[in-house]
Design a protein with these regions (language model features):
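Short, Lys/Arg-enriched N-terminal segments with co-localized hydrophobic residues
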Residues: 1-12
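Short, polar/acidic, helix-capping and beta-turn segments at strand->helix junctions
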Residues: 13-163
Length: 163
């Protein structure tokens, strides 16, 4: 009798099992830095406010194309994905309720000549796909901006559909 294929086993894993296999522990919801809430649920959609990149609990500052390269920006976007999932879990109680990551919007603090915002944002998109499987495939926008609050290098917001 043949063993299930790796692709089948991957589909059979729960979101929490995937997080555990990746060594990811989701953080608590960060306290907003201004007059807004971390998330809003409207019907079966959850809108998660922009999360900035953090390192060691402090804003991960820098500008892509000046003092940060694409690979480092991608790491920052991946770190944001972990924070976004922590907020999403707080919003719905269990990530198994997520039926689809609908949209990701990324703002990349970058110099005028930096053109790899899409590659930076892949740090978030790739992790969401790894954790949620097919449900993690999403629409996306990635923008280069002159500055982000607190000097952060990347800010990302997310919309998810939940059961």
């Amino acid at each position: 009798r043949a063993l299930p294929s790796p692709a089948f086993r991957e589909r059979a894993m729960s979101v929490n099992d995937r997080l555990k296999s990746l060594g990811i522990t989701l953080p608590p919801v960060a306290v907003p830095a201004a007059a807004y809430v971390p998330f809003v649920r409207s019907g079966n959609l959850v809108f998660i406010s922009g999360h900035i990149a953090r390192r060691d609990g402090k804003p991960w500052v820098g500008q892509l194309g000046r003092d940060m390269d694409t690979a480092t920006g991608k790491q920052a976007a991946r770190a944001i994905a972990i924070d976004l999932m922590g907020t999403l879990q707080a919003a719905v109680g269990d990530l198994e309720k997520v039926t689809r990551i609908v949209k990701v919007m990324s703002l990349v603090n970058s110099t005028p000549d930096f053109t790899e915002q899409h590659l930076v944002t892949n740090g978030c998109s790739e992790l969401l796909a790894e954790v949620f499987g097919d449900k993690g495939a999403h629409a996306r926008s990635a923008f280069g901006v002159a500055q982000i609050p607190l000097g952060a290098c990347v800010e990302i917001e997310l919309i998810a559909e939940v059961a």
